[in-house]
Amino acid sequence: MGLSDGEWQLVLNVWGKVEADIPGHGQEVLIRLFKDHPETLEKFDKFKHLKSEDEMKSSEDLKKHGTTVLTALGGILKKKGQHEAQLAPLAQSHANKHKIPVKYLEFISEAIIQVLKSKHAGDFGADAQGAMSKALELFRNDIAAKYKELGFQG
């Protein structure tokens, strides 16, 4: 299920665009996640009270968390699948503390793809979308394996 060097290059090329505005991208990803899958909002005590898109857009906490999420994901993507050291603490916190099911990681992966398609259409064609989907699936599969090791049924 690994990615070729060419696929990793496509992933990292578009990720460079994300890094030019991590707070903006992170905010958009979380807003899309919460709009498309409102049940995910229940896992975020800081954001549960945000009901409208306008409230979400004006939330500094949401923007900060989006930055945290995409910064962590960027660090993992740059490892090109050799992300064990980065993944272990992330899996631990998401399993034991936050109780985030793997399904929600699928939902945020979808949100990431949709945001990249809307913001970077010219740099995120079918090949790049396919490569990013594979990279995010690899990440989710590895998180799921860690969850299993930790005894979390998410």
UniProtKB/Swiss-Prot annotation:
GO molecular function: heme binding; metal ion binding; nitrite reductase activity; oxygen binding; oxygen carrier activity; peroxidase activity
Superkingdom of the source species: Eukaryota
Phosphothreonine: modified positions: T68
One GO cellular component term noted in the UniProt record for this chain: extracellular exosome
Modification Phosphoserine occurs at: S4
Binding residues annotated for O2, in chain numbering: H65
Ranges for domain Globin: 2-148
Compartments it resides in: Cytoplasm, Sarcoplasm
Principal location listed in the UniProt entry: cytoplasm
Gene Ontology biological-process annotations: removal of superoxide radicals
InterPro entries, alphabetized: Globin, Globin-like_sf, Myoglobin
Protein name (Swiss-Prot/TrEMBL): Myoglobin
Source species of the chain: Erinaceus europaeus
